[in-house]
């Protein structure tokens, strides 16, 4: 009833920023294309710049939206959200990590962008022992030949790909970067220096996403050859 009354008074008006100024911790949710794309100016000016404690749950991100088509396949949201000062950007890999990320987002003081896909993915984290920390990547497998940084649903795909690489004698280090901003700079540099070769895998444009975040770090601290696997948004 209260929600209905509010919608009658505030038709098509966002009130999350206002609630945050009153000490509430609002969570808003929509398709990533709308949460990050259509709403970018409002997120930037009403939430990001005043650093309000609003959490954005963006669903149906990436190309796995499938039959909803290109208009709903958001491949730019990470790039957009990374540019907003103080915005934390999290892209969980499975159900266990998603639950933990939501709790961590609630505890964090400041704006958080949580990126979720549409498709079900295999659960590979153990809920009883899993620990989530914003800004800390997770080494899923150590290796010496190449480092593969993955995020979101691409983490499970990367774990499977590693098994194929192993058959070819390639010892790959697999790292789950669930927090793209702030990225785990120490882990990125350490692993890149260890293997000397880096691959990034994401369900996002290769411009402005995980690959770009990794390259930003390595360009400054440990220049390394990087192959970015994602969606090529342009052909030139």
Predicted regions and their residues:
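Amphipathic, non-transmembrane alpha-helical secondary structure
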Residues: 13-14, 41-44, 99, 103, ...
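Conserved protein kinase catalytic domain
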Residues: 10, 44-47, 215
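Thiamine diphosphate
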Residues: 65-66, 117-236
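Short, structured active-site "lid" loops
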Residues: 7, 27, 196-200
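Conserved thiamine diphosphate
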Residues: 18-147, 156, 172
């Amino acid at each position: 009833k209260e929600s209905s009354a509010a919608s009658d008074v505030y038709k098509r008006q966002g009130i999350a920023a206002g609630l945050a100024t009153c000490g509430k911790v609002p969570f808003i949710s929509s398709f990533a294309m709308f949460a990050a794309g259509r709403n970018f100016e409002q997120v930037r000016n009403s939430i990001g710049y005043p650093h309000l404690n609003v959490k954005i749950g963006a669903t149906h991100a990436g190309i796995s939206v499938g039959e909803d088509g290109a208009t709903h396949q958001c491949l730019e949201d990470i790039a957009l959200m990374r540019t907003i000062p103080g915005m934390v950007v999290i892209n969980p890999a499975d159900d266990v990590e998603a639950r933990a990320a939501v709790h961590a987002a609630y505890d964090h003081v400041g704006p958080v962008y949580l990126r979720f896909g549409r498709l079900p993915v295999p659960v590979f984290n153990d809920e009883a022992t899993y620990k989530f920390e914003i800004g800390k990547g997770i080494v899923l497998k150590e290796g010496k030949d190449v480092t593969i940084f993955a995020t979101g649903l691409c983490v499970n795909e990367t774990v499977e790909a590693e098994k194929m690489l192993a058959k070819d004698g390639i010892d790959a280090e697999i790292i789950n970067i669930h927090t793209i901003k702030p990225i785990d700079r120490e882990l990125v540099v350490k692993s890149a220096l260890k293997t000397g070769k880096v691959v990034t895998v994401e369900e996002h444009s290769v411009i402005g996403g995980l690959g770009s975040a990794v390259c930003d770090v390595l360009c400054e601290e440990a220049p390394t050859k990087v192959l970015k696997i994602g969606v090529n948004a342009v052909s030139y």
